[in-house]
């Protein structure tokens, strides 16, 4: 069976790591990844990857090229991750393949997923309110990550996409009265706003934002942290907490 996983994120975070682990640990089928060229280098080198330029869910040209690429690959299943990819595939799908969609968080608008043949949720909460065939597969803990033993803890750590849902603005604003350093690791469209918030609150000596790093480097940050903070406004099944 030939399965295409579709990820059109602009940054490599929890969803993308989830897909990377699926593709590198399930060898019984022919697995293929279509992703934005900006994040392709973060995935395991053994994965068969087709790179595409980033495009919006309403881009006629972007959807036309994607539809042609999928037709050339000729998969049995297209597995989408996130609302953007699910919406796009629902609008271009043919009868030649099945559409499986995974919901990785708590979403307000779940109707866009209901055109898929099967919906997977990372938690029961993520699947609430969906009137369709669903299955819950909880996020997992990767066995290669070792228990942290470092006692020389240096800072508080937060990890995730720099988007409003992750609540980093709330975390930064609350840090004014805390006498400790905070490291936020991630990339995304809220970066400039968060940096401005750090400056406005005179926190540049205590709070630092670091671009998304690869898994091996992220483990070093975990080992040097005294505490992990999850400030999300909503979470379906936080991988960072499992790590």
Identify the meaning behind each predicted range.
Residues 233:
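Aromatic "clamp/platform" in nucleotide-sugar-dependent glycosyltransferases that forms part
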Residues 115-146:
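Donor nucleotide-sugar binding/catalytic pocket of nucleotide-sugar-dependent glycosyltransferases
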Residues 70, 212-213, 220-225:
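Short alpha-helical donor nucleotide-sugar binding micro-motif in glycosyltransferases
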Residues 5-62, 69:
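N-terminal strand-loop element at the rim of the active site
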């Amino acid at each position: 069976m030939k399965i295409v996983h579709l990820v059109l994120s602009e940054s490599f975070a929890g969803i993308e790591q989830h897909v990377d682990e699926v593709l590198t640990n399930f060898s019984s089928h022919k697995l293929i990844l279509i992703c934005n060229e900006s994040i392709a280098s973060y995935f395991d080198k053994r994965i068969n990857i087709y790179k595409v330029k980033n495009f919006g869910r309403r881009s006629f040209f972007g959807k036309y090229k994607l539809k042609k690429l999928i037709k050339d690959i000729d998969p049995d299943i297209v597995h989408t991750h996130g609302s953007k990819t699910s919406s796009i595939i629902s609008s271009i799908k043919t009868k030649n393949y099945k559409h499986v969609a995974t919901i990785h968080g708590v979403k307000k608008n779940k109707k866009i997923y209901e055109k898929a043949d099967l919906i997977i949720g990372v938690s029961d909460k993520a699947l609430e309110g969906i009137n369709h065939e669903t299955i819950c597969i909880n996020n997992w803990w990767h066995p290669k990550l070792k228990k942290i033993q470092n006692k020389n803890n240096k800072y508080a750590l937060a990890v995730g996409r720099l988007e409003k849902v992750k609540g980093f603005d709330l975390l930064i604003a609350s840090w004014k009265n805390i006498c400790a350093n905070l490291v936020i690791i991630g990339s995304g469209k809220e970066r400039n706003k968060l940096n401005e918030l750090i400056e406005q609150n005179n926190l540049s000596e205590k709070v630092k934002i670091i671009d998304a790093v690869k898994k091996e480097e992220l483990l070093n940050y975990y080992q040097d942290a005294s505490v992990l903070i999850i400030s999300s406004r909503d979470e379906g099944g936080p991988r960072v907490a499992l790590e």
